[in-house]
């Protein structure tokens, strides 16, 4: 068995920073799949990525010449020869397909019969000729939404590929990938005089890049170095860096030869609101702000250069100038915004389109105002304060700062509202209206914020359904699924007693003053929410059977649904709960066989067996005991009480003949079972739990 080190490096033009990790991981996984498919063994694989290269280093790859055994079974002997002993057409076709004559075939015999059979060993394609094909396949199978095309052959990848290295120990593996011939010349740093670095042995990778031009090919080592460097620099000026993994990941994907540099800016810019200042430094300039021990910003930031140079001062001065210009713009936008109060911008929303066929942001604001007023009746929020928050909710969208920094919407609204002496809860709601922004994100903390978030999301959902922008199986351009999950989470986790049916109807009514399509739209929205609710519970860890058992009962009150799902999950964990479930299954099967609908009242006088009287008494006792429990939605207590039916049901089936010769007694016993089924199905459809 011959084992060697295989190196593959793909030199590219600058890859998108936000996609680098995804692309490199896909390349790594796809390559492993290809190796497994071709039965090529190896010890381990390590992957590398920088803005201008993707690489794989495969240790102890087995390049031993290999054979594959081919087995092909033909027609049975009976069907292979005719009565005169000549080959049939079926046998002739099979021999031709295998490329053999009858003398090369053998007979396979077992207890089931006898067949023509062909077995041979075929030499597999040489691994050296396979590797370039495997590499190209692994690259082409990377899922990328937006690709670039280049060259006469119209090749396609995230960015044009310019260089290929395939090295097996010291040997260059000949072959083309994307019509580029492999060689032993690595792509050098963009700033280097020499465009390539010669590599003699695969084992020297990635050390040779670091030694020749300070290139750190390992993404994770590069990331750790950046973190360590910025923390050390911040400590030198008695500051610290707040953890921002998104920025760290982005910067790591932007550089391959990182050098952290401390840069200062004028202290006057510290008067700009903190969120604007941070956003300018982090989002616009991809730099790291520095904080003091009191968590206040210092007039410094750290820039990660992509070049190792003795002339760092020039880079620092250049970044000072750029940052000064950016902060000056931010200062101007902020001062310009503060010339007028936030509320005075309300009418300006008339000029801003919310969505085609759905009017302006001003009209959306008025709908939100009416909807939050209705929602406030079901929550602990003040109605007037809720209305005030609704009227101010979109005003910051026409400010200069938000136009320049869209990601600050809501945050700037809150800041300006506080500056205008609005109530704190009203101001806070302006930021909280956009929560949750993604799966697992925090929820609004204030009652007004919860109401505003629900109203805003519900208005958008209703509007999009109204104009037909409904998510398909694979497309959701307006992120309506996320909005629906946001509404569901707020209602459930904040325990707001909102009826989903009423909420949807109220929201639709604000778009549509009575229309025949109202009912169709309503049904579509209910179905949409129920699907989202099912998936959310499933992702949360609840059993699909339990979720279906509750949702199939058509309850629209989310809190009620939530309590039932929790209760059924609790019940399923109880000892012997399965015996109750199987009893319900038996009852359901008996009732399902009845062709005519079972109607009428149970008549105790028709009960002649002790077991049916005991069961009836248990039902009456259950009804009396659980009357208030149902009103209070204490489903755990109800299900514990349901367990008390276990023995009476068992004894009933053991001692009582349901199909009595007297039709009245038979009907009475079926009514008893029907009553039992209704008790169980009042909480959930237990048929999903069988």
Curated annotation (Swiss-Prot):
Its main location: cytoplasm. Its EC number is 6.1.1.14. It catalyses: tRNA(Gly) + glycine + ATP = glycyl-tRNA(Gly) + AMP + diphosphate. PROSITE patterns: AA_TRNA_LIGASE_II_GLYAB. GO terms for biological process: arginyl-tRNA aminoacylation; glycyl-tRNA aminoacylation. It is found in: Cytoplasm. Keywords: Aminoacyl-tRNA synthetase, ATP-binding, Cytoplasm, Ligase, Nucleotide-binding, Protein biosynthesis. GO terms for molecular function: arginine-tRNA ligase activity; ATP binding; glycine-tRNA ligase activity. InterPro entries: DALR_anticod-bd, Gly-tRNA-synth_bsu, Gly-tRNA-synth_heterodimer. GO terms for cellular component: cytosol. It holds the Pfam family tRNA_synt_2f. NCBIfam families: glyS. Tetramer of two alpha and two beta subunits. Belongs to the class-II aminoacyl-tRNA synthetase family. This is Glycine--tRNA ligase beta subunit. It comes from Buchnera aphidicola subsp. Acyrthosiphon pisum (strain APS) (Acyrthosiphon pisum symbiotic bacterium). The lineage of its organism: Bacteria, Pseudomonadati, Pseudomonadota, Gammaproteobacteria, Enterobacterales.
């Amino acid at each position: 068995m011959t084992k060697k080190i295989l190196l593959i490096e793909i030199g590219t033009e600058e890859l998108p920073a936000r996609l680098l990790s995804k692309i490199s991981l896909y390349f790594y996984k796809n390559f492993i799949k290809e190796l497994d498919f071709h039965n090529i063994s190896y010890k381990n694989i390590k992957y590398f990525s920088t803005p201008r290269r993707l690489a794989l280093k495969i240790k102890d790859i087995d390049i031993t010449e290999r054979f594959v055994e081919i087995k092909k079974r033909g027609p049975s002997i009976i069907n292979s020869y005719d009565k005169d002993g000549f080959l049939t057409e079926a046998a002739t076709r099979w021999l031709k397909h295998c490329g053999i004559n009858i003398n090369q075939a053998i007979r396979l015999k077992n207890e089931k019969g006898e067949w023509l059979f062909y077995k041979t060993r075929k030499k597999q394609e040489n691994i050296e000729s396979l590797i370039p094909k495997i590499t190209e396949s692994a690259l082409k199978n990377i899922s990328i939404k937006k690709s670039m095309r280049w060259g006469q052959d119209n090749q396609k990848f995230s960015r044009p590929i310019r260089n290929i290295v395939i090295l097996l120990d010291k040997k260059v593996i000949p072959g083309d990938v994307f019509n580029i011939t492999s060689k032993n010349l690595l792509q050098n740093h963009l700033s280097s005089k020499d465009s390539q670095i010669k590599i003699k042995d695969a084992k020297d990778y990635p050390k040779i890049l670091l030694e020749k031009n300070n290139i750190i090919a390992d993404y994770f080592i590069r990331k750790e170095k950046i973190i360590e460097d910025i923390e050390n620099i911040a400590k030198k000026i008695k500051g610290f860096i707040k953890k921002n993994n998104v920025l760290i990941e982005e910067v790591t994907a932007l550089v391959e030869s990182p050098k952290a540099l401390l840069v200062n800016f004028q202290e006057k810019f510290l008067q700009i609101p903190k969120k604007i200042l941070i956003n300018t430094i982090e989002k616009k300039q991809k730099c790291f702000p520095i904080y003091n021990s009191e968590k206040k910003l210092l007039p410094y930031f750290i820039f990660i250069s992509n070049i190792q140079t003795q002339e760092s001062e020039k880079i620092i001065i250049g970044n000072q100038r750029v940052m000064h210009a950016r902060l000056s713009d931010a200062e101007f936008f902020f001062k310009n915004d503060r010339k007028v109060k936030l509320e005075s911008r309300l009418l300006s929303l008339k000029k801003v389109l919310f969505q085609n066929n759905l009017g302006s942001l001003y009209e959306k604001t008025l709908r939100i105002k009416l909807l939050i007023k209705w929602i406030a009746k079901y929550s602990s929020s003040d109605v007037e304060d809720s209305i005030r928050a609704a009227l101010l909710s979109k005003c910051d969208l026409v400010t200069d700062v938000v136009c320049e920094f869209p990601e600050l919407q809501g945050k700037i609204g809150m800041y300006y509202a506080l500056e205008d002496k609005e109530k704190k809860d009203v101001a806070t709601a302006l930021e909280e209206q956009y929560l949750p922004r993604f799966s697992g994100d925090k929820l609004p903390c204030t009652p007004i914020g919860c109401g505003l978030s629900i109203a805003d999301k519900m208005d958008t959902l209703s509007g999009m359904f109204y104009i037909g922008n409904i998510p398909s199986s694979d497309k959701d351009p307006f992120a309506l699924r996320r909005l629906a999950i946001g509404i569901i989470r707020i209602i459930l986790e904040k325990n707001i007693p909102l009826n989903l049916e009423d909420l949807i109807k109220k929201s639709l009514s604000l778009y549509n003053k009575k229309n025949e399509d109202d009912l169709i739209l309503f049904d579509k929205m209910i179905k949409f929410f129920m699907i989202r609710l099912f998936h959310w519970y499933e992702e949360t860890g609840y059993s699909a059977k339990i979720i279906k058992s509750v949702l199939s009962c058509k309850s629209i009150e989310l809190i009620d649904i939530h309590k039932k799902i929790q209760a059924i999950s609790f019940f399923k964990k109880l000892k012997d709960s399965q015996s109750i479930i199987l009893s319900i299954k038996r009852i359901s099967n008996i009732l399902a066989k009845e062709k005519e609908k079972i109607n009428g009242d149970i008549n105790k006088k028709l009960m002649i067996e002790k077991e049916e009287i005991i069961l009836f008494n248990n039902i009456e006792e259950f009804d009396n005991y659980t009357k208030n429990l149902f009103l209070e939605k204490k489903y755990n207590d109800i299900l514990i009480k349901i367990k008390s039916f276990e023995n009476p049901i068992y004894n009933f089936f053991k001692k009582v003949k349901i199909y009595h010769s007297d039709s009245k007694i038979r009907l009475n016993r079926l009514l008893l079972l029907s009553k039992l089924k209704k008790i169980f199905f009042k909480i959930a459809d237990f048929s999903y739990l069988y």
